[in-house]
Amino acid sequence: TLTAINLAISLAQESNQEVILVDLDLRTPRVASYLGLNPQFSLADYLTNDVPIEKVLLKPDVPGLYVAPGAERLEQSSEMLASHKMAVLAQTLVSTSPSTIVVFDMPPLLEADDMLTFMPHVDAVLFVVAQLETQQSDLERSNELFKELNLIGTVLNKSRDEAPSNYY
């Protein structure tokens, strides 16, 4: 989640493009709380209560950045991500403008089938792994799943290794 937030903020600050950060970790949504936002509505409201997406989107204090927050835990997250309404939302957000970048924050790949369910709606995947937490077997399983995707890179998170002092 922090990697998705940092990526979205960086893209919004470095480009003349709008960036929409969508919290699709529906089992453990954290984007709004990490950004200090208090949403009146969330993606759950859009998906289950017919709240228009315009009422869900928030504008934090970062120029060019919009956030579609999650708010409460949804037990049927895979079903929600596979729904027609989610497909329409993904298409709507992506086609908002040719210069709009949409960053989807997803739950861990192997903990639920949410990412697999949502894969048809993404153009590219940035894989985040945690040093000393992600197992080799999980990396191998994930690599098999990514063969069908445009994997643009891997981020090593929680690294404690330091560069040599003569690095620069």
Task: Name each model-derived stretch.
Residues 2-168:
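P-loop NTP-binding module
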